[in-house]
């Protein structure tokens, strides 16, 4: 098969070779010095379902800025789907005591979250005027209704059974969320890991109703404190805990960027779904996934090593916790 450019262009002849591989027509051609291959089986478009993907942007208004709003949120949903996928893999790896592999997976989740953080900058190009041209068309549609976002929160450890209510009209999504609600979270798997390593994790934290809100325990905080105080003795647990902490750190940064973007676009208006908008998002910043991993940091003290006596008795930390000041005096 030969192909020629139009007469106005320099004539180029390309020979396409056709073969049959595994019963599928395959083709090969040399273009710009590169051998390009394709077949009638799996193509780029078929693999990625690009026809379906690129036809899924259906505005409800005739306002041009709505396309940005739709694509921004659709891409966010895809990244959240990947984060959920990786979180499930990480839980399987921790359950199997494959901590090195779990660290790699947690690193990937952190990278996904960092990408999601920067994606808010795209939505921030939407001015208040731009958004108001189509906001009314959205009616009560709201990110609060994202079942994937809720799935990710459940996977990481923030469980709220009452949040299933908004999915009552979709039995399939509600059932999927309910399954995650009643399953152990990433933090539950970490507690099981601590127990396997001999730490005194209370039985009621290991064998509990996973659909209920987790209540922190002093014994769990003590376990993390021991690991962080003596990292050389518990290096794999210490290293894993830092990866887990990074996941929450980036998730909270994503929440913060979400809140600031909403504030920039709509101020303190009520959200489209009826929530308090910015005020609701501010409250979410105080909802931790791994509470004892954060709490024990306040109790850590500096080792008495030469002239390093700062905070040796923990008084400075307690004062900072009491008055809310920065440990550097700011």
Language-model segment annotations:
Residues 3, 8-330:
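Surface-exposed peri-terminal alpha-helical interaction modules
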């Amino acid at each position: 098969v030969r192909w020629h450019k139009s007469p106005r262009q320099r004539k180029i002849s390309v020979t396409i070779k056709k073969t049959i591989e595994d019963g599928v027509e395959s083709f090969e051609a040399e273009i710009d010095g590169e051998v390009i291959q394709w077949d009638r089986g799996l193509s780029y478009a078929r693999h990625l379902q690009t026809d379906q993907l690129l036809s899924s942007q259906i505005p409800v208004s005739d306002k041009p800025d709505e396309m940005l709003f739709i694509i921004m949120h659709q891409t966010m949903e895809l990244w959240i789907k990947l984060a959920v996928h990786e979180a499930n893999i990480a839980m399987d790896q921790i359950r199997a005591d494959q901590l090195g592999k779990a660290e790699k997976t947690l690193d990937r989740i952190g990278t996904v979250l960092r990408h999601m953080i920067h994606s808010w900058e795209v939505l921030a190009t939407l001015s208040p005027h731009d958004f108001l041209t189509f906001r009314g068309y959205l009616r009560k549609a709201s990110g609060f209704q994202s079942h994937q976002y809720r799935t990710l929160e459940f996977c990481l450890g923030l469980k709220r059974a009452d949040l299933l209510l908004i999915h009552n009209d979709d039995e399939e999504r509600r059932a999927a969320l309910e399954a995650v609600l009643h399953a152990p979270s990433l933090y539950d798997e970490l507690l099981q890991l601590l127990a396997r390593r001999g730490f005194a994790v209370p039985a009621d934290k290991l064998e509990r109703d996973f659909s209920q809100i987790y209540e922190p325990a002093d014994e769990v905080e003590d376990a993390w404190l021991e690991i962080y105080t003596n990292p050389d003795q518990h290096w794999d647990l210490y290293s894993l805990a830092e990866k887990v902490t990074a996941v929450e750190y980036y998730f909270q940064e994503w929440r913060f960027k979400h809140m600031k973007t909403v504030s920039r676009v709509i101020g303190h208006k009520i959200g489209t779904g009826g929530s308090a908008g910015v005020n609701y998002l501010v409250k979410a910043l105080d909802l931790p996934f791994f509470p004892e991993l954060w709490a024990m940091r306040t109790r850590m003290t500096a080792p008495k090593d030469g002239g390093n006596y700062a905070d040796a008795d923990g008084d400075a930390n307690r004062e900072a916790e009491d008055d809310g000041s920065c440990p550097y005096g700011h």
